UniProtKB/Swiss-Prot annotation:
Name the UniProt record assigns to this protein: Serine--tRNA ligase
Lineage: Bacteria, Pseudomonadati, Spirochaetota, Spirochaetia, Spirochaetales
Keywords: Aminoacyl-tRNA synthetase, ATP-binding, Cytoplasm, Ligase, Nucleotide-binding, Protein biosynthesis
Compartments, record wording: Cytoplasm
Gene Ontology molecular-function annotations: ATP binding; serine-tRNA ligase activity
Cited PROSITE patterns: AA_TRNA_LIGASE_II
Designated gene of the protein: serS
CDD domains, per the entry: SerRS_core
Functional pathway: Aminoacyl-tRNA biosynthesis; selenocysteinyl-tRNA(Sec) biosynthesis; L-seryl-tRNA(Sec) from L-serine and tRNA(Sec): step 1/1
Length: 425
């Protein structure tokens, strides 16, 4: 969330950010509720002082009539306090709800747009493969190479679940090991994180849906959710702590990810591209305010290194205002070339990295001491290292050959133990 003083002092900036994101929020209502809350707190303080004064007088040696009068006054004050405290509770709940809706401000270089078509392409890297045969999509390859089974998964678990089989199992594990080893070599602390988080942590990370429907699963009769990303559990790791940020804290977390993906159907969402469960390695960093921009660029550089070493053609996008999540100050996406996408080939999102500044840490009370010994809220940066399902799509579709098999990128062979997946009759 944003600091209330910052909102008051930069009201036009905050309103422009809300409008640029395509959100409809009444920021003046938030200010009104904050003013009302403060007035109620002041009134409650004044009434408590009167009540204490009234109680002190009752300790004195008084005649019966005056004592009865003080008792009646005490009852009136008590009732007034109860009413005001109940009103304060209602106003505070409304205030918190409105406060959580306010998104982060935007970096000055975020493109202003009204759809994903307005995302700005920064560059393209790699050569898109030219086949002298009709390439298959990953669903055909998964069937012909006996790697994927959606039909049995649909019977057992429902739509948008899948079985990985045979070499695809080792390919997923190889991608995880490849990315975790790279991040460890770059100084990241490596974690396997819980797949469940408590509601206040999910809320603190700021997963604000545009509609009323959350994209993650709540566990019935609990305050817990299945995580949609280990950003949630890594980001919550230092909840309510003052941390040492002499150096940035870089973390890499492996987790399963669970998402509802309601309404996600059609050619562009088929197969492994948009599923209810997948595995992912996430990068996360806690740093000082002045370091988050550099860390954000560092995360993008690591993502580019990963896809360059995997030999997958990709492009980098600066994400426009409409396409940003509420916590993000700035976001980059990498989209990989997928020859089977939409029947003719196209780029599909495989990673994102976001600088969330102190938007998340303010909710989660994660602080550090600056050089003057003052508590400051940490800046938090996140980014995908590997989301296995979409990278498997890219590998199968880009490295297929005329014999119907698939070559494994050289950087993965030491992790898979094989360099080729042959066609199976």
């Amino acid at each position: 969330m944003l600091d209330l003083k910052f909102i008051r002092d930069n009201l036009d900036l905050v309103k422009r950010s809300i409008k640029a994101r395509g959100l409809v929020l009444d920021i003046d209502k938030l200010i009104y509720l904050d003013d009302k809350r403060k007035k109620l707190i002041t009134k409650i303080g004044e009434l408590n002082a009167k009540r204490n004064e009234n109680s002190s007088k009752m300790q004195e040696n008084l005649d019966k009539v005056l004592k009865i009068s003080l008792i009646e006054t005490g009852k009136i004050l008590k009732k007034q306090l109860i009413d005001l405290e109940e009103e304060l509770e209602r106003v505070s709940v409304d205030f918190d709800l409105e406060n959580k809706k306010v998104p982060n401000i935007l970096s000055p270089d975020v493109p202003i747009g009204s759809s994903e078509e307005d995302n700005f392409e920064i560059k393209r890297v790699g050569v898109v493969p030219q086949f002298d045969f009709k390439p298959k999509d990953h669903l055909e390859l998964g069937r012909d190479l006996d790697l994927l089974d959606f039909d049995r998964a649909r019977e057992i678990s429902g739509s948008k679940f899948y079985y990985l089989k045979n070499e695809a199992v080792f390919l997923e594990i190889a991608l995880i090991n490849f990315s975790l080893n790279k991040l460890r070599d770059k100084g990241f602390d490596v974690f396997i994180t819980p797949d469940v988080a408590r509601e206040f942590i999910v809320d603190g990370i700021g997963f604000n849906p545009r509609g009323n429907e959350s994209n993650i699963y709540k566990i019935e009769d609990t305050d817990k959710y299945l995580v949609g990303t280990s950003e949630i559990t890594l980001g919550g790791y230092y909840y309510n702590k003052i941390i040492d940020l002499t150096l940035p804290i870089r973390m890499a977390g492996f987790s399963h990810c669970f998402r509802k993906e309601a309404g996600a159907y059609g050619q562009l969402s088929k197969g492994l591209y948009r599923v209810h469960q997948f595995s992912k390695v996430e990068m996360f960093c806690f740093c000082k305010a002045e370091e988050s921009g550099v860390i954000h660029d560092e995360f993008l550089s690591i993502q580019e290194q990963i896809f360059t070493e995997l030999e997958i053609p990709y492009r980098v996008l600066n994400i426009c205002s409409f396409d940003l999540g509420s916590p993000a100050y700035k976001k980059y996406d990498i989209e990989a070339w997928m020859p089977g996408r939409d029947g003719k080939g196209g780029y599909g999102e495989v990673t994102s990295t976001s600088n969330c500044t102190d938007y998340q840490s303010r909710r989660l009370k994660i602080r550090y001491k600056d050089q003057d010994g003052q508590n400051k809220f940490a800046h938090m940066v996140n980014g995908t290292a590997i989301a296995t399902t979409r990278v498997i799509i890219s590998i199968l579709e880009n490295f297929q050959d005329q014999k119907g098999g698939v070559r494994i990128p050289k950087s993965l062979v030491k992790y898979t133990g094989f360099d080729y997946i042959p066609f199976k009759n």
